[in-house]
Amino acid sequence: METLETRRLKLRQWSESDFINFARYYADEDNARYVGGKKDPDQAWRHMALQIGHWNLKGFGYWAVDHRDTNEFIGCAGLWQSPGWPELELGYWLVTEHQGKGYALEACVACIGYAREVLHAKSLVSYIDPRNAPSIRLAKRLGAAHEGSIELATYGSHCVFRHY
């Protein structure tokens, strides 16, 4: 797994020490409502392992995201493609205290660059819950265009935003 660095962030391989903040994020229903829902610690552990395993299965996935100045884990961002999903998806989440600071934009720009330059992705989308206004705004800031909706197993109807 390649490490990506931006002006303020480091996107890196997951470590066991990330679990505390990962589990804390998923324990909060407000945080987790758009990323599969609230999880108890055992479910969160399995979900973090899923993030790590995606790299082995597909050769890409989500990175753990640290703030470069503090080395603090602030969330994750990356690329995903579940079986049956027609395209590569760009996604992210940040712990509450780091939202609204432009970190998601910065991390997503790095992920888009990786998708285009390393994976040579011809197509990249974000599947966004229609109630998730902050993620819709971010997709638009990234230059993505709304293309309709898709029904995702276990997640329901989501807006499709295409990144050009």
Q: Which ranges hold each PLM region?
A:
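Acyl-donor (CoA/ACP) binding surface of acyl/acetyltransferases
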Residues: 1-34, 49-53, 64-164
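Active-site rim helix/loop that mediates acceptor-substrate recognition in acyltransferases
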Residues: 41-59
